[in-house]
Amino acid sequence: ELVKGINSTRDKADALFKFVRDKISYSSYFNTIYGAEGTLIKGYGNCCDQAQLLVAMARSVGLTARFATGKCVFTSGLDVGHVWVQFYIGGKWVVADPTSTRNSLGVIKNWNTNSYTDRGTYDVLPY
């Protein structure tokens, strides 16, 4: 188990985040295709499927997590809808976008977090 022996909520979230970020390759396609289990088995997924996996893993160990959605401008110039995860840690929501190794728990570097269009948060991703 990835979080065995880890006690703090933040450290558990970080361990799960790093697993998905570092072990699940990014693949470009729209909407959820594989879901959490399929993404884990295949070892790759888009933002939706990577988020599905991370949220499922978080909830399986008792962490509170949800899906965040928006239209984001990436550092590559791509301007597109995107999905990432938010963990509830220490009384606040902390971002977690596992689609880039440049990102860390609470820090997104692969798209402009100051100019995205918020499209809401979800307990269950609608697509």
Give, region by region, the residue ranges found by the protein language model.
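Hydrophobic/aromatic-rich core segments of domains that either
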Residues: 52-127
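Short phosphate-coordinating micro-motif centered on Lys-Gly-acidic
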Residues: 49
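Secondary-structure boundary elements
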Residues: 1-45, 53-55, 120-127
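Detector for Asparagine
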Residues: 7, 31, 46, 103, ...
